[in-house]
């Protein structure tokens, strides 16, 4: 079972406790073992930290970093605490300016669970949450703005 994260890049640190609870709930309640997170902004950093913290209790859990750009362009090693990188198939011909959104769309369409923090109406995070709501086989957990 794969869980992905979508959230605003300017998310406040006060969200961390909600993220940690959501990650643990997904491990305990849903049996999620694989988490994939982006690498742009505060929400992604907090989501990664929540999974890294959970891995101390649940060593079977893995964390991958989503690569929107082909690793051949710029080699990316998994940062400390991560287990691997993930570059979605079929992204090779996507123009760079669309790569982040396309990689996120791929994950929305191919994950089992989504943890989302998307309250800003005109944001890409919100658009991706709306896309997720139209997917038939995804369970969405929305974090509350504090």
Tell where the protein language model's regions lie, with residue ranges.
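Acidic/glycine-enriched connector segments
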Residues: 1-2, 7-146
């Amino acid at each position: 079972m794969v869980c992905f994260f979508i959230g605003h890049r300017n998310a406040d640190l006060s969200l961390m406790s909600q993220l940690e609870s959501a990650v643990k709930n997904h491990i305990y309640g849903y049996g999620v073992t694989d988490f994939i997170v982006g690498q742009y902004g505060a929400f992604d950093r907090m989501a990664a930290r929540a999974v890294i913290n959970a891995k101390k209790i649940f060593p079977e859990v893995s964390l991958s970093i989503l690569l929107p750009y082909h690793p051949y362009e710029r080699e990316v090693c998994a940062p400390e605490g991560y287990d691997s990188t993930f570059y979605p198939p079929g992204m090779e011909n996507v123009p760079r300016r669309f790569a982040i959104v396309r990689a996120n769309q791929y994950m929305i369409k191919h994950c089992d669970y989504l943890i989302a923090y998307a309250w800003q109406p005109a944001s890409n995070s919100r658009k991706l949450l709306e896309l997720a709501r139209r997917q038939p086989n995804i369970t969405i957990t929305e974090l509350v703005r504090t």
